[in-house]
Amino acid sequence: MKKSKYFCLSFVLFFNLFSLPVKPDAIFEMGKDVFLNKAMCGSCHALSDAETVGQIGPNLNEIKPDIRRVINAVTKGIGVMPPFEGVLSTQEIEAVAHYVSISAAE
């Protein structure tokens, strides 16, 4: 009985590893589209994956922001960066945060 419990647990854990966010996924691609086109983040920010070299805002490759930091900055604005709350949907903000946090971490 114990062996079957451990086998089932191992099976579940093994397959959960493959469900972690890995690019390209739909949210990642949506976030990249928001970054490049709708919010035009690359105008101000450098990000290697997006091939952008903006120099007004911080270089995202260097600061490697986590998803919460990106959501907060995009939603409320920070420094000279305007808030995008009301401009982007919650889903778009979460998608761009997902994209930036994964791309900058590489």
Predicted segments, located by residue:
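N-terminal export/targeting leaders of redox proteins
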Residues: 1-25, 106
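C-terminal capping alpha-helices of c-type cytochrome domains
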Residues: 87-106
